[in-house]
């Protein structure tokens, strides 16, 4: 993100939506190339979901993060609860010896029914001396937003809403690194807080109301990581302890009478301890052996009107081993993870059905390297997805009126995934692949009829199969001026050439009681370096319509929009300035038929916006300053696996 001006302009969520293959929707959440995503930040589970996760990513400035890693074939070293894929948002940047700092700022503007503004500021300060290194990153985001939504059936408008939002978001991240000869200790503390207000005018069959919602969320995260190193550089032993807490309060009040409509909240506490050991030895040509154990516990308590109506506990114990080997042009990965789950709790009226289960999750990959940087890869892994606390929460932390409600389900059961993938990749940019994911007991959000209205619920679906095809094709414009032979020499910097990148994906969801068709997804991104080294980037997303996406048939293309960005660096490349316009033609909207009902859902956000963003690396006067590894990300990848993702 930090080097891609079209991605780091705006919020993290706006940048993620531009990634080929990543789908974000109001009704179905986030998926990447047909795989359910688990969201990590700095290699640690974020542990927030649904509308809280969306709000968090919309509030986090994209120019405050370094990169996004998407792991499409998570091996045994990753928790089996990762589902099908992991997205890791890395906020940290490289520390430098002696004091250095980076300042980031952004502003954007929209005008629909009225003018609205967004602005963010962040500062990263880091330094290193002979005893320890440290980093501090802090920032804020002010976000005004607009949304209109519509629920209707064939003859009646059930609910027509306009929402005027004002969100305030603050974050503070610290990192300390202590070196003890070969060993090191990393200490991290993160704090984020958001205060979101919304004015909601709604009308529909039999009602008209004007409400105000307040949503306050605080998140604390502490991590300790001790990295033991040996004379044998391939031998590594890591110990990590992580504590994460989330507190959320949601209130909805009528603006006319002042009466309370909703008074809900929850408290969540998550502990995790893990240790990992790895070592290389001579077998075939080179083999790496990894093993480790993990224990974590989640405590979740939901309140309604000050009374606890869900008390939920989950404990996980796991152990894994994995081998990565290479022999001539072949690479192999074989691993397995054993996980044990204990889930219990109670609502205000009854005890939850206890869940005690131990499962084994194998994974295997084989890769054939045709020539350097060109390979064929086949992968299988079994994963599980435990119901997240947003889906379990029986209380409404979204919005409701007399005709529209949102419900969680405390009795949801885990989902088991069998994931298969085959891929051909060349030079990191071209790829063609097919994947299949078979899910048993899939947790799914559905819109159903509820009396004379509509309700959003979560439930288990016995069997879901997702077929996914992907193609990524880079087209350097020099191909037309210098020919194929010169282009294939790859004697150039990709960031400094003119090119077009095309992505095509096809996804089909097969459900037991739905007969639907698949969806095609398209993305085109072009970079042109203009005179004075001004970088112009254009990005276009769209999809076909009429296909089923789980229990929804899309009436409008997913995230259809055209964005442009102009970027230039100044002051010896220390100052980066970008000017952008997102959704120029104002085409980004959502529209779905809720299958099995006669309900239609439509929504439109203020997606057309113009803005400017800047990053200024305050130069150090000390010529001895040099970069060190980042320390806000406490799970540093020190080596690459035998098989790339």
Language-model regions, residue ranges each:
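Outer membrane beta-barrel strand-and-loop segments of large Gram-negative receptors
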Residues: 270-274, 413, 431-502, 513
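Transmembrane beta-strands of outer-membrane beta-barrel pores
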Residues: 105-111, 129, 140-144, 180, ...
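Flexible loop and strand-edge segments within Gram-negative outer membrane beta-barrel domains
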Residues: 112, 143-270, 312, 385, ...
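N-terminal periplasmic accessory domains that precede
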Residues: 12-15, 53-57, 69-70, 82-107, ...
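Extracytoplasmic beta-strand/coil segments of soluble accessory domains associated
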Residues: 13-49, 85
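Surface-exposed extracellular loop regions of Gram-negative outer-membrane beta-barrel proteins
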Residues: 91-107, 145-148, 190-203, 241-242, ...
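Outer-membrane beta-barrel signature, preferentially recognizing the C-terminal barrel domain
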Residues: 219, 354-355, 374, 384-440, ...
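Conserved C-terminal beta-signal and adjacent last beta-strands/turns
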Residues: 321, 516-645
């Amino acid at each position: 993100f930090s080097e891609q001006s079209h991605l780091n302009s705006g919020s993290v969520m706006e940048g993620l939506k531009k990634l080929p293959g990543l789908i974000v929707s109001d009704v179905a959440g986030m998926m990447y190339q047909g795989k359910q995503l688990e969201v990590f930040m700095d290699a640690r589970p974020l542990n927030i979901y649904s509308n809280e996760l969306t709000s968090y990513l919309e509030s986090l400035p994209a120019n405050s993060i370094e990169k996004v890693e998407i792991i499409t074939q998570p091996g045994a070293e990753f928790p089996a609860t990762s589902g099908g894929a992991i997205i890791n948002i890395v906020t940290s940047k490289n520390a430098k010896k002696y004091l250095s700092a980076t300042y980031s700022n952004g502003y954007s503007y929209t005008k629909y029914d009225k003018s609205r503004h967004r602005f963010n500021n962040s500062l990263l300060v880091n330094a290193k001396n002979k005893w320890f290194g440290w980093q501090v990153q802090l920032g804020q985001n002010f976000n005004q937003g607009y949304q209109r939504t519509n629920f209707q059936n064939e003859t009646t408008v059930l609910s027509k809403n306009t929402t005027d939002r004002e969100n305030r978001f603050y974050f503070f991240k610290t990192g300390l690194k202590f070196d003890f000869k070969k060993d090191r200790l990393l200490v991290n503390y993160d704090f984020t807080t958001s205060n979101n207000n919304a004015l909601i005018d709604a009308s529909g069959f039999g009602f008209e109301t004007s409400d105000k919602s307040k949503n306050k969320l605080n998140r604390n995260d502490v991590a300790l990581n001790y990295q033991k190193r040996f004379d044998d550089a391939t031998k590594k032993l890591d110990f990590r302890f992580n504590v994460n807490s989330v507190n959320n309060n949601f209130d909805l009040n009528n603006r006319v009478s002042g009466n309370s409509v909703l008074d809900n909240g929850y408290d969540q506490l998550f502990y995790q301890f893990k240790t990992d050991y790895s070592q290389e030895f001579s077998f075939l040509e080179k083999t790496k052996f990894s093993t480790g154990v993990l224990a974590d516990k989640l405590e979740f308590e939901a309140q309604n009107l000050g009374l606890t109506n869900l008390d939920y506990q989950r404990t996980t114990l796991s152990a894994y081993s994995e081998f990565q080997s290479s022999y001539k042009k072949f690479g192999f990965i074989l691993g397995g993870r054993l996980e044990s789950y204990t889930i219990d709790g109670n609502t205000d009226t009854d005890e939850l059905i206890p869940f005690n289960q131990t499962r084994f999750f194998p994974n295997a990959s084989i890769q054939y390297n045709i020539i350097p940087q060109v390979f064929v890869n086949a992968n299988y892994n079994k994963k599980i997805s435990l119901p997240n606390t947003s889906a379990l929460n029986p209380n409404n932390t979204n919005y409701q009126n007399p005709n529209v409600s949102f419900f969680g389900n405390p009795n949801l059961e885990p989902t088991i995934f069998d994931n298969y993938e085959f891929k051909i990749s060349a030079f990191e940019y071209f790829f063609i692949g097919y994947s299949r994911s078979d899910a048993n007991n899939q947790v799914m959000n559905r819109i159903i009829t509820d009396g004379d209205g509509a309700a959003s619920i979560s439930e288990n679906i016995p069997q879901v199969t997702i077929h996914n095809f992907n193609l990524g094709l880079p087209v350097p414009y020099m191909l037309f001026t210098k020919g194929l032979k010169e282009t294939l020499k790859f004697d150039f910097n990709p960031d400094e050439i003119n090119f077009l990148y095309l992505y095509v994906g096809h996804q089909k969801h097969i459900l037991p009681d739905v007969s639907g068709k698949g969806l095609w997804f398209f993305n085109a991104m072009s970079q042109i370096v203009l005179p004075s080294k001004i970088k112009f980037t254009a990005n276009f997303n769209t999809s076909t319509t009429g296909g089923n996406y789980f229990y929804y048939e899309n009436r409008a293309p997913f995230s259809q929009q055209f964005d442009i960005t102009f970027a230039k660096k100044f002051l010896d490349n220390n100052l980066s300035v970008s000017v952008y316009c997102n959704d120029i033609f104002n085409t980004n909207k959502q529209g779905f038929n809720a299958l099995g009902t006669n309900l239609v859902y439509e929504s439109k956000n203020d997606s057309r916006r113009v803005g400017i963003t800047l990053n200024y690396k305050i130069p150090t006067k000390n010529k001895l300053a040099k970069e060190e590894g980042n320390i806000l990300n406490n799970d540093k990848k020190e080596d690459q696996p035998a098989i790339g993702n």
